[in-house]
Amino acid sequence: MQVKYIKALSIKRIYAERIVSGAKTIELRKRPIGMELGDLVLLYETAPDSIIRGGFIADKTVSLPISKMWTQYNDVMGVEKEFYDSYFDDCEVAYGTLIYQSFCFRSLSLDQIHKLCPGFVPPQATINWRKNWHFQPEWSEVLSRGRGELIQEGRLHEQLNFFAYQ
């Protein structure tokens, strides 16, 4: 599997649930966090949950002035205006990654992640998945399917190179 296409993103449970349910189809941040079209983004739910149980295939990333981001995307943000304004206080630009597809996965607790992924530290924002870390077969399936659909749509041009995993 090409782990360069897998990221882990720290997120509060409520927003992870909204992403997986489809109520939130853009992930907002104060700065760019390196998600690219076709990446599989694993949602690491922060404490007290400390678990990965969902994710999404990243669509395009947009950056807009705070007011324009709200005007264009508020109906798919999954946040209220008061929270949005507070979160982006003192910022001029908002960054958002649109969500192409979202998924539920078999849960991995932080204890399980530590056992399966040597050196894993919960991300402050995002981290790239490492080659020596565990990955679940379903992650490979959704990554391959999502990227395949983006290729068919003519939006992505790089094919994945998978190798057999024992």
Regions found by a protein language model. Give the residues of each.
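Contiguous surface segments at macromolecular interaction interfaces
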Residues: Q2-I6, I11-I33, L37, P48-R53, ...
